[in-house]
Structure formats: C-alpha cells, structure tokens
Amino acid sequence: QMKAAAWNNTAPTFDEYLISLTAKEIAAGVENAVWNGTAAASGSFQGFLGAGGTFQTDATINNVVNAGTPFVQSNVIANMSKALAAVPSTVYGKEDLRMYINYKTYRLYISEISKLGYVNAYNMNSDYVPVFEGVKLAVSYGMADDRIVVAEKSNLFFGTDLLSDQTEIRTLDMSNLDGSNNVRIVAKYSAGV
C-alpha cells in the first residue's frame, strides 16, 4: 500500500498503478489509430488518414498533398495556407471548422510566427488562442508528421463501447496458475472512426 502525500499522484496499490500505466499506453495507441490506423493491422481499426496518409476520397473531400517535402519552419505557413485554400467558401466560416495538425507542425508554426513577431507569440501568454487565418488549430497527438486536416469537428466521429461485458481492463496474477512471479494485463475494448 502506497502512502498518501501532498504531491503523490500514484495509485494506492500496485494493481491500480499498473492498470493506470497501461491505460495511458492504450490511450496513446488509440489516438494514433484514430488518425493513422489500418484495418489490416491486427487489433487496430481504419483511421481517418489510414496507410496512405489521406482521407478516402469522394466528391466532398479535397485531399491536398504536400509535394513530398517535409514541413520545416520556412514552409509551414505555405503548407497551412495551401490546405485552407482547398476549403469551400460554404464551409470556411463554420464555427466548428478546425485545422488538425500534430505537435511538430504546431511547433514549426509557433516558431515561424514568433520570428515574424505575430501577437507576441514568442511570449505565448495565456491570451493567445491558436488560430491560422481565422480557423482554430487543433493539435492532435496521434497525427503523423507533415499532415494537415481541415474539417468540421462535427464531421469527425469516434465511437467506442463503454457499457458492454466486452470492455474491461484487469491484472491477472500468474502465481496461482503456473507458480511464476508474473503479472499479465487483460484489456478488451472496441473503437473505431
């Protein structure tokens, strides 16, 4: 049993700690799968971008592909502008329109606007709201490098089953089963976009 302290944010038992640590790893994997997952991979699901790095195209999706050049500080604003230029005018003013980028792109963007002296971004005080040309930025952990998605957040769906018997996470002490000093973790859940 771990003792309480003012700055102790660990779980009181080892089992609870192990489950919380595993849940964080699972959450990171799900965040990655939301954007980059492929249905062909065992234990994964088809993400928004999938293996090709672009949405499945239909008449309502404009895939703007970077010409193979990685994003750097000097071209990040041009790439963001190129992505916004493909947004139809009927969508551009929508309140829930977001530009989804990863932390590399966000860091490059902040660095570039800081260099240009935009709204004192080099200071990054609490007044700054991340926007680009009037569109709010949504920084996403799981998104791959050199990708930009501009979409209404109401058009991106993530689903999971939280209430069934098929959703669980628990530890399994192997000492009673095979005499070993091992602990296994069982995690069952379903998710998809």
Task: Outline where the language-model segments fall.
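Alpha-helical scaffold segments that mediate packing/assembly in large oligomeric complexes
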Residues: M2-A85
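Short, surface-exposed loop and linker segments with low hydrophobicity and enrichment for Pro/Ser/Thr
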Residues: A6-P12, A85-Y92, Y141-A144, V149, ...
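Short secondary-structure junctions and interdomain/linker hinges
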Residues: E25, G29, A33, V87-E95, ...
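Internal mixed-charge
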Residues: A27, E31, Y103, V139
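Short coil/turn segments at secondary-structure boundaries
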Residues: V34-A39, K94-N102, Y122-M124
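Sequence/fold signature of self-assembling virion shell proteins
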Residues: L49-A78, R98, I110-V193
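Ordered core of a single globular domain
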Residues: A78-I113
